[in-house]
Amino acid sequence: MCIRDSDMTIPIGSRVALVGRTGSGKTTLAHLILGLFRPTDGVLTLDGVPLTDIEMPAWQANCALVPQDIQLLDASLRENVAFGCDSEDIDDSQVWAALEASQFNDVVVSMPYGLFTMIGENGVELSGGQRQRLSLARAFYRDAKVLVLDEATSALDSKTEHDVMQALDLVGRRCTTIVIAHRLSTVRKCDRIFEVENGRIKAVGDFE
């Protein structure tokens, strides 16, 4: 989906939502913000300063994406949460904090090997909801400044989704959060909602 004639401002520390039909351009717009796609026209700015190719890696290092289609390692829970870190460099207290924020710590405590439980190829030993909570924990471990949740709670039941979004109230305001969702309950606490249609921002408002 091509994004056209669109301009948006996202204040630091805010939580915004991108809503619209499947294929409307929500994910493409989020990928442009993350620098995963480069605009052929227009610019991505930070505090009014355009981000250049030289600055883009530093920007991306401060961003985290929790997609709907999660890719997990055939490794331990601990290694999956601290994805990209050497085993000896993993901070277990930070791992537990990330698991608590994603409402997954109680499940891990109940597992025979705890953090060292192997999850199988792409998390085959976990349920869909558990895989998504683990992916959220990975983002929380990175302490990202910009967090994009692309239908990240779609496989969670209503109570768990509520718990995860409540956890975002505690940790999310330390970063800027962009939520892509279909459920109205998911975007209820967003400061600003952008409706995307056919690659354009059709309307901007809040939940009320």
Residue positions per predicted region:
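ABC-type nucleotide-binding domain
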Residues: 4-208
